[in-house]
A protein has these predicted regions:
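Alpha-helix capping/termination and helix-coil
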Residues: 65, 69, 84-95, 129-132, ...
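Long, charged low-complexity segments
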Residues: 36, 97-163
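Internal, Lys/Arg-enriched amphipathic helical interaction segments that engage polyanionic partners
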Residues: 1-56
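Short, hydrophobic, well-ordered secondary-structure elements
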Residues: 55-62, 73-92, 151
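Short, well-structured alpha-helical interface segments that form or flank functional binding sites
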Residues: 53-56, 71, 75-82, 97, ...
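Solvent-exposed, amphipathic alpha-helical segments
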Residues: 56-67, 121-131
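Short, solvent-exposed segments of well-ordered alpha helices
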Residues: 45-48, 52, 67-74, 112, ...
Length: 163
């Protein structure tokens, strides 16, 4: 059976120190366990909330981290921020504003001073993920950080919406 084969291959990959895993027949890069759990939790929350667009963006962020031979680092940052922006728009019921505008209009959506960290994340993503300049390439670990923080923020915002 395919699930058993997938499980056995993943165990083998771990035992051999191979940084890959098989997920639903697709080979993906293995990320740090805490990042994997954060993304998985966010994906489930988004699925249950019916936020398919944000879920798709988060999935694309993960796929971009897994691309080989070179990860699409800027793509992962862009998709992670897009997921966060999509959820923020939905929770704020403001479907036209950018994430930067939403953060200014709804400063209490994320409690201070945590809201400042999201503003800084937005700035980082704008600088390194969207409007990248020659010689200023983000690192893989920075992309993982952005994806993880966005996944956690998405989970928080969906929870806030459901209160």
């Amino acid at each position: 059976d395919s699930e058993k084969l997938e499980s056995e291959l993943n165990i083998y990959f771990i035992e051999q120190g191979i940084g890959w895993k098989l997920v639903n027949g697709n080979l993906e890069a293995r990320n740090p366990e805490v990042l994997e759990q954060t993304i998985q939790s966010a994906t489930i929350v988004l699925q249950e909330a019916g936020s398919q667009t944000a879920r798709g963006e988060l999935h694309e962020a993960l796929m971009d981290l897994s691309r080989r031979p070179e990860a699409d680092i800027t793509g992962s940052i862009q998709h992670a921020i897009a997921a966060l922006e999509c959820v923020f728009r939905d929770v704020a019921n403001d479907h036209k504003s950018t994430l930067g505008e939403l953060l200014k209009r709804y400063p209490d959506m994320i409690p201070a001073p945590l809201n400042q960290s999201i503003e800084k994340l937005w700035g980082f993503a704008s600088e390194y993920g969207r409007h990248i300049r020659e010689g200023r390439n983000p690192e893989f670990s920075e992309a993982q950080l952005v994806v993880g923080v966005c996944a956690a923020a998405v989970t928080y915002l969906i929870g806030k919406k459901n209160i």
